Amino acid sequence: VVPAAKPVGSFTAAQVEAAYQTSRKLLVAGNLNKVALLGGPPTAFANLLNSQERAQFLGSLNTKGVSKDGSPLSTRVEVTSFAPGSAELVGNVIKVRGTMSAKSAAFAGTTVLAISVNYLFAYAVESPGSPADWTRVVAHQYGSFDFAQWSDPGGPLQPWDDTGGDHAGALCGSTDGYLRPDYPSESASAPGPTPSGPFMNPYSNASAGGSAACAQTTHV
């Protein structure tokens, strides 16, 4: 459920309402779309972006490697997507908790309608072919969708995705943007960095370490 829309700065209540609805669609397409979740193309998410960002998103979707801070270069990190063949959803319920709000802000030299979001998505997943081997993965998306007339001056407001995220219950060290669940049977021999640093509560909306972080979690 999105908040009741009110005028914000120079933006009308109708523009705020439209931005809320588009932000909701982006959250759903990026975190609840079954095709993208199970490693397929995130088409629904890409179609909601403005044309400039869509081209960037699709152009780097299959890029492999990491940046200097260790975060994947692939734009697939902008959605929640398990590596093909690494997970099956347990049941039909994905738990969601979060908030969104609107404000006028400056972004890239432009006055934008910023829809701030802070959401947690909790998935129960099992190893394909081994239903007894299951775990939970928690995705945390935060930041803002910034609305302006990015590629169509005089047209409707369009979103620019300026959000980030954390994940718990997935292996660290992804080089392709996909998530790989940290199943109990594989934890001891799992590849990738070992979680370190302060413990993080994955169910807290305040936990925001960034996509390159490999923090220890209290539980999943």
Name what the model sees in each region.
Residues 1-78:
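Core segments of small alpha/beta cavity-forming domains
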Residues 12, 22, 43, 63, ...:
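Residue-identity detector for threonine
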Residues 45, 100, 115, 143-145:
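Generic structural hydrophobic/aromatic packing signal, biased to beta-strands
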Residues 51, 58-70, 86-91, 174-195:
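Extended interaction regions within the primary functional domain
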Residues 56-136:
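Extended amphipathic alpha-helical segments with heptad-repeat/coiled-coil character used for oligomerization
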Residues 118-220:
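Extracytoplasmic/luminal low-complexity segments enriched in Pro/Gly and acidic/polar residues
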